[in-house]
Design a protein with these regions (language model features):
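FMN-binding flavodoxin-like domain, especially the glycine-rich phosphate-binding loop
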Residues: 2-29, 39-133
Length: 133
């Protein structure tokens, strides 16, 4: 059974997003298809954010970022992990991304995580965020 109010948003990391969605009983949605109505109608999000070199969001995520700022996020819970990017190079930008979501009313759930780093453990991260989504 899918938890309709949780949406896992991904770009090129569909397999990881679907695994997280399965663990949460949520829906996985491509960043290319997320729209303002879905953002307004959902209560919680897991964002699988991607960065290009020099700490820039990928074009699809940049567009989604604008969508997430076009509507109020008040009361919405958002967990963020970086699937493409370098923790050393992108950490400040990723933290700023989270801060901007908070400025728009979102509550950031859990710690910002980077897939593929030594401390990354998908199961542990999902267990940590799931009670708060």
């Amino acid at each position: 059974m899918k938890h309709e109010s949780i949406v896992v948003v991904y770009d090129s990391c569909q397999a990881i997003a679907e695994e997280i969605a399965d663990k949460l009983g949520a829906e996985a949605v491509s960043v290319q298809s997320i729209n303002n109505r879905q953002i307004e109608n959902s209560q919680s999000f897991v964002l699988a954010v991607e960065f290009q070199s020099a700490g820039q969001l990928t074009p699809h995520w940049l567009y989604a970022y604008l969508n997430f700022h076009a509507v109020s996020l008040k009361g919405k819970k958002i967990a963020v992990f970086v699937t493409l990017g370098n923790k050393h190079d992108d950490d400040c930008v990723a933290k700023e991304f989270c801060e901007k979501l908070k400025e728009n009313g979102a509550h950031i759930v859990g710690e910002l995580q980077y897939a593929g780093t030594p401390e990354w453990n998908l199961d542990n991260w999902v267990c940590a965020i799931s009670p708060n989504l």
